[in-house]
């Protein structure tokens, strides 16, 4: 027996850390993304793009999933993707959406203009401008009478 024994939880964390993807961009519900999905048919493989709005992002670790919705010929199409699946080649974030819900079920009843989501502007990086101690303003001169 080995000197150090791993618990089941430690083994699970170790295996998951090897399989988890690091190249997933930051996005959330309401954002428009393109998922490049690898499809294998017979001996050929090809990449299929699926562009739509993220309706839900759920779970953590290897079991994290997203639901992406798009309208195709007036019919709503939703697809569930496992984020850390090897079938996903890459994910591109096209537009940042401004929503106040984590699960956008109300988009299912809407189509066209009413299904639009406002755009969220990315936060600007605020530069900290600190003046050095020697750059202080000189003290005001005292009034002479």
From Swiss-Prot:
Gene3D superfamilies hit by this protein: 2.30.30.790
Keyword Lipoprotein appears in the UniProt entry: no
Keywords, alphabetical: Ribonucleoprotein, Ribosomal protein
Top-rank taxon: Bacteria
PROSITE patterns found in the cross-reference section: RIBOSOMAL_L19
Keyword Protein biosynthesis attributed: no
GO cellular component, one term: cytosolic large ribosomal subunit
A GO molecular-function descriptor: structural constituent of ribosome
Composition skew (Basic and acidic residues), residue ranges: 112-130
Described purpose of this protein according to its UniProt entry: This protein is located at the 30S-50S ribosomal subunit interface and may play a role in the structure and function of the aminoacyl-tRNA binding site.
HAMAP family per UniProt: Ribosomal_bL19
Name assigned to this protein: Large ribosomal subunit protein bL19
Gene: rplS
């Amino acid at each position: 027996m080995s000197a150090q024994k791993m618990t089941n939880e430690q083994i699970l964390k170790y295996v998951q850390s090897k399989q988890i993807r690091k190249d997933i961009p930051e996005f959330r519900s309401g954002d428009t993304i393109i998922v490049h999905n690898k499809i294998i048919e017979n001996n050929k493989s090809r990449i299929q793009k699926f562009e739509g709005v993220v309706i839900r992002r759920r779970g953590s670790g290897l079991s994290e999933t997203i639901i992406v919705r798009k309208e195709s010929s007036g019919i709503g199409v939703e697809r569930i993707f496992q984020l850390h699946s090897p079938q996903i080649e890459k994910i591109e974030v096209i537009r940042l959406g401004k929503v106040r819900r984590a699960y956008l079920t109300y988009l299912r009843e809407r189509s066209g203009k009413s299904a639009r989501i406002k755009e969220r502007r990315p936060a600007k990086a605020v530069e900290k401008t600190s003046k050095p101690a020697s750059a202080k303003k000189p003290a005001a001169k005292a009034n002479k009478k």
